Amino acid sequence: MSQNQQREQLGSRIGFLLLAAGCAIGLGNVWRFPYIAGAYGGALFVFIYIGFLLAVGVPILVMEFSVGRAAQRNLGAALQKLEPKGSRWHTFGPLSLIGSYLLMMFYTTVAGWMLAYCWSMLKGDLSGLTPEQVGGFFGGLISDPTSSCLWMGVAVIFCFTVCGMGLRRGVERVVKFMMVGLFALMIALVVRAVTLPGGEAGISFYLMPDPEKLTGGLWAAVTAAMGQAFFTLGLGVGSMTIFGSYIDKSRSLTGEALYIVLLDTVVALMAGLIIFPACFAFDVDAGSGPGLVFVTLPNVFNSMPGGQLWGMLFFVFMSFAALTTIIAVLENIVAYGIDVLKWTRKKAVTVNFVLVFLLSLPCALGFNVLSGIQPFGPGSMILDLEDFIVSNNLLPLGSMVFL
């Protein structure tokens, strides 16, 4: 069976849309977006961010789709097939693959934290803890090398198992289930958050522009919004190119890109409607960085009636968002082995499982065994370096290749 025939095995257009949206919808929407929006003034940042999505994100997404549909391959093989004779565009293929590996090096660690919190919420480990104890719980998780590597490994094993099941029976079926579950959980969480007493102040902060709330200056907000637009769509490393190979030639690439950007934006905005009303209702800082998800929100859930249930649902939702992105990016990595190196799917999955797990260890160990490595000075971690390389450099620069 040819590779082209294999790609046509996606069961439906909705399968394509949810799969591509699953790649875009991830921690960038529900872990990164709310705390960055909170740090840069709420609504004003949101408007700048949406402007970048429409002006830059959609055109580059269309370009990535067009390369994939024209070649019916992943980015590495597509560039080899489409480049003019004598040119060297194909050299970007391995570079884009490196970008995907770098993204997975820290993404899998954070996904592992989400899974750990799901399990802990289910068992009630965080129920009744004081704010200091909740902070100590997160600190204990990331400072324990065994726990960090174990939960990172669970995320890697699960996602590669899905990829190993094949495109249609594994990737499409699992991601469709997770995406439907993600939207259902999100709606329930939004309804609960916006009905909290005092939550209207958070809604106002989030949706009403106020330049006086803009900390760090307008230029800082603009650059943060641009980086977030590239990060959330996964542009610049070729992850979206492979999904272009699944688009029927009768479909408009711009239309499909707009649908995916719309789904991605809805999730990001709804994540804010979960987090900001909850934070304002319980008088906590909505711009407190990644600790917002792992320390602040568990304290909020502990203050709510039925908080254990809502906390568990929230971290299931977060896990779905993280895992769908990992599965989609890993499918792109696996496809490189199949299309370019002519490996079987089984070999591509096996080799890359070992590689991704080993590459993810520095980040998982960066908060404990390797905590002495502080690339940006005291307090910084290996995760910060990997995030900076990907979000602020590889994604924007890689996107320029498609222009």
Which residues does each predicted region cover?
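Membrane-embedded translocation segments of transport machinery
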Residues: S2-Q6, L10, E172, K176-L323, ...
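Hydrophobic alpha-helical segments of multi-pass membrane transport proteins
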Residues: A322-A328, V349-F367, D384-L403
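Membrane-interface "cap" regions at the ends of multi-pass membrane proteins
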Residues: M1-W31, I60-F65, R69-P94, K213, ...
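Extracellular loop-to-transmembrane helix junctions
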Residues: E8, A37-M63, S147-S148, L395
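Transmembrane helix-boundary motif of multi-pass solute transporters/channels
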Residues: I14-F52, G238-G244, G255-L258, L262-L263, ...
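Juxtamembrane helix-boundary/capping and inter-helix hinge elements in multi-pass membrane proteins
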Residues: A39-L44, A70-L75, K85-R88, G124, ...
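Inter-helical loop and helix-membrane interface segments of multi-pass membrane transporters/permeases
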Residues: N4-E8, I36-Y40, A70-L95, T108-R168, ...
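Transmembrane alpha-helical segments of multi-pass small-molecule transport proteins
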Residues: G15-A21, P94-L97, D125-M165, G234-T241, ...
